[in-house]
Amino acid sequence: MDAKSERSLKRPSWDQYFLTITRQVAERSTCLRAKVGAVIVRDRSILATGYNGSPAGLPHCTEVGCLIYESKNPDGEIELNCFRTIHAEINAITQAARNGAAIRDADIYVTHTPCIHCLKVLINTGIRTIYYGQPYKLATVTDLLRYSRVRIVQVPPEGAPP
């Protein structure tokens, strides 16, 4: 392959690469309402992955249905949630802890912006930056982000201008 051909083979940025992996991880989700994946990274190495679903060993929503409850967001919006589901970010943090991987000052890539509960946990774990693909209720986490040292960055789709 000549130099010109090599230049024409565009490699994804590291951010796009890890975000693509979050989408693959999300395919393992057993949630009927959303497929979310998370990848915790430090120095371009994956420390842990997680997807949303039931706790290990318990029945999945895909098998027995969801256990839905209502909650009210700080903005007054009523939201439907599932008792059974653990979010992707929490599963990734749990996997890191079980495997002895320290995640302080690491970054997390998530298919969607974290919910307010996951954001609070991410702040406490010392995650440095949250990279996400799709916004999800971004307004509910904006105030909390403003007071934390955690950065949040939307990764543009592959092929989008930088």
What are these regions (language model features)?
Residues M1-P162:
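Zinc-dependent deaminase catalytic domain
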